């Protein structure tokens, strides 16, 4: 039998030994001495049962799991975690706007720069290409013809400041016609061929 069962048996045996007044189950009222005597007997049993309960608790604590000791746990810090502060120079920083003149804005919009093409002299081109004088020396149109071997002296794009309709063209077929005419006609006293004057009259 376990300690708790022994305790219940001792408590029940002690309760049986208490003299119960005869008038407890009667309808007639009992006197005060009888009531106080019964209460004193119950009080003694309760006090004795407390001793039995203490012994049973010691017995139970040996077999029970060890209780957690919360005193050894680290206490929570009172300080709050804060996000890292950003440096002040990054907040509110505004990029400085560089103001350009209207002419500069127009030139940058249409690709006009201070650089000029070494063949046609144009400054307006979407892309600078490699030429016989190095990288970025020809405009896009002249650079494409240079890569294919068709960059001839008679070729000029329409945007070239040196473009002359009677001696230049931006079409390869027309360029070849101008070259054939120059080779077929002998130059006159001014150094120009007859084909030069004929193309000038026709408006080419």
Swiss-Prot record:
Compositionally biased residues, Polar residues: 185-196
Broad class of where this protein is predominantly found: nucleus
Any GO BP: regulation of DNA-templated transcription
InterPro entries linked to this entry: GATA_TF, Znf_GATA, Znf_NHR/GATA
Gene Ontology cellular component annotations, sorted alphabetically: nucleus
N-terminal signal peptide: none
Basic residues: bias regions: 79-98
Name assigned to this protein: GATA transcription factor 14
Gene name in the database record: GATA14
């Amino acid at each position: 039998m376990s300690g708790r069962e022994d305790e219940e048996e001792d408590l029940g045996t002690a309760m049986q030994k208490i003299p119960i007044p005869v008038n407890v189950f009667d309808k007639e009222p009992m006197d005060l001495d009888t009531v106080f005597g019964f209460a004193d007997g119950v009080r003694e049993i309760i006090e004795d049962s407390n001793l039995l309960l203490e012994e049973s608790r010691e017995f139970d604590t040996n077999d029970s799991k060890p209780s957690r000791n919360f005193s050894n746990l680290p206490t929570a810090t009172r300080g709050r975690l804060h996000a890292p502060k950003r440096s002040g120079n990054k907040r509110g920083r505004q990029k400085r706007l560089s103001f350009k003149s209207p002419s500069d804005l127009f030139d940058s919009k249409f690709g006009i720069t201070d650089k000029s093409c070494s063949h046609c002299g144009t400054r307006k081109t979407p892309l600078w290409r490699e030429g016989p004088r190095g990288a970025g020396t020809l405009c896009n149109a002249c650079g494409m013809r240079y890569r294919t071997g068709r960059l001839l002296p008679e070729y000029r794009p329409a945007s070239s400041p040196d473009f002359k309709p009677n001696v230049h063209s931006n079409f390869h077929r027309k360029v070849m016609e101008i070259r054939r005419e120059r080779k077929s006609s002998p130059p006159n006293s001014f150094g120009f061929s007859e084909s030069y004057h004929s193309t000038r009259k026709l408006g080419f």
